[in-house]
Design a protein with these regions (language model features):
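N-terminal hydrophobic targeting signals that begin at the initiator methionine
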Residues: 1-2
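Bacterial N-terminal signal peptides
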Residues: 5-15
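Sec/Tat signal peptide C-region and signal peptidase I cleavage site
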Residues: 16-20
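Active-site-proximal alpha-helix that buttresses catalytic centers in soluble enzyme cores
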Residues: 21-107, 119-160
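Acidic/histidine-rich alpha-helical segments that form the ligand environment
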Residues: 109-111
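Short beta-strand segments
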Residues: 113-115
């Protein structure tokens, strides 16, 4: 039921802005298996969150998926990319400028899976004035950014 409410919210949002600028959904990678490994896989909970993201975004007409060089971002995006038959584009985590350039050139909606320490800078670079911080243990945020002359932000949360 919680998934349904979120899906309906996103569908209404997309219908409202159908003729407007593309929507970029930005999420932090899902929970990782080990804090000790520099490039860990997702944990079981993280895999569940990645699957939930694909379900949440299934009607969002995602045409581009952007991930970093780290497995946790790639594994978080994989179910959504598979569902939309989209090959993810890898952009280095520290190259926000290159990512912003690609996002501003979009003709469709996109998913960006990043990191808690890079998403605030990405949002700022896209024109979101309100500062955002993501606690180290928070994997629940979904940022929907309407990329255009005046970027707008809608903050959503996973239902778990």
């Amino acid at each position: 039921m919680k998934h349904l409410a979120l899906i309906l919210s996103i569908s209404l949002l997309l219908a409202t802005y159908a003729n407007a600028a593309p929507v970029v959904f930005i999420v932090r990678h899902a929970e990782k298996a080990s804090a000790d490994d520099k490039n860990p896989d997702l944990s079981v909970q993280g895999q569940k969150r990645a699957d939930a993201l694909a379900h949440i975004l299934k009607d969002s007409q995602i045409t581009s998926v952007f991930v970093t060089e780290f497995k946790r971002t790639q594994e978080t995006a994989a179910p959504t990319a598979r569902a939309g038959h989209v090959s993810p584009t890898v952009i280095p985590a520290n190259d926000i400028g290159a990512l912003v350039e690609k996002l501003r050139a979009l003709n469709g909606n996109a998913l960006v899976v990043g990191h808690g320490n890079t998403i605030p800078d990405l949002l700022k670079a896209l024109g979101i004035a309100t500062p955002v911080s993501i606690p180290e243990d928070d994997y629940t945020e979904i940022f929907a950014v309407f990329v255009g002359d005046a970027a707008q932000l809608l903050r959503l949360h996973y239902p778990f």
